[in-house]
Amino acid sequence: MSNFLSLCNTRASVRDYLPTLPTTEAIARVKEAVRLAPSACNKQPWRFFYVTNPEILAQLCQTYPRPWLTTAPALFVAVKNVAENWVRPADNHAHGDIDLAIAVEHLCLAAAEEGLGTCWICNFDIEACAAVLELSEEWQPVAMTPIGYPGEKHQDAGRKRKPADEVFVDLV
């Protein structure tokens, strides 16, 4: 298996973390992977908040009140600039969410390479999150992920994936 496929297979949604903060060097490499992520017309309509402050972490955890989230020593919150989205002319569809998703997955894969766990979270109170981060109107929270070393309770549940013939249509 290639290194990349192995990395893709390693990445999992982690819902239990050790209290130890990731190293500064590991976070720097994760941040660099995010910085290198592509976006439509290279607009890069994003900003990422890396949060380790206990008070702010507690407030952000209240926007997605799940007990497991409070085990994370740090969070990344990904926000998009709605004024900087590339918009497809054919149907006026803004691509900020897509661009941000690409960057967040870069984050998750880079974290996995560092031995860190992450978990995509999109079902949170974005208005409360925006208030915690003191965002102006042009910035909108899209996703957040805890980041840290997987805890003892973390178990890879054996992700089930659809077979290739249900995913791909080859037109040859």
Where do the model's predicted regions map?
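Small-aliphatic-rich amphipathic alpha-helix that forms the alpha element of a beta-alpha
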Residues: V34, F76, D91-V132
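Residue-level "edge-of-site" marker
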Residues: R47, F124-I126, A143
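A short N-terminal beta-strand-loop micro-motif at the entrance of redox/enzyme domains
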Residues: S13-R29
